[in-house]
Amino acid sequence: NFEFEASVIIPVFNRVRTIRDAIKSVLCQEANFKYNLIVIDNHSTDGTTEAIKEFAGDDRLIHLIPERKDLGIGGCWNAGVHHPKCGKFAVQLDSDDVYSGPDTLQKIVNAFYEQNCAMVVGTYKMTNFNMEMIAPGIIDHKEWTPENGRNNALRINGLGAPRAFYTPVLRA
């Protein structure tokens, strides 16, 4: 059993310019389930750690600084997935990304139930810091087709943001 239906996991290293917006976009999500945010800070030195601490008053936020300094994005992601407070669905958000609206997390979790799947990959829009669209624009993962098969992730590097997984599969 999971205490949280979903956990948004943000691995971060030296992203003081973007981490606040990423965190705000998660904490403003409107969902009909309990969720939390796990930020794994890989020993940032640019003020990122202090920026994350600004949100310490929100008990949905778990701020982790791993013992090791060499984890990288994958090691930080794994630390989040294996944290005891990680929810039933682990949703990765990059530290320089924001959700497009307050219902994004709800849509991701709904997709798990509607499609009876273990992984959800969504569409995203490339923008500058003023949220103006820049090339290549909308990334829609049209390469994920029935013709390409369910194991297309093994053939292409198409696991773009947003991406989410059924946590028990990741922990197996």
Predicted features, each with a name:
Residues 87-98:
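Short beta-strand-to-loop acidic/aromatic patch adjacent to the donor-nucleotide binding site
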Residues 26, 42-43, 71, 95-96:
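Conserved short acidic donor-positioning loop in nucleotide-sugar-dependent glycosyltransferases
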Residues 41-50, 69:
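A conserved acidic beta->alpha catalytic loop
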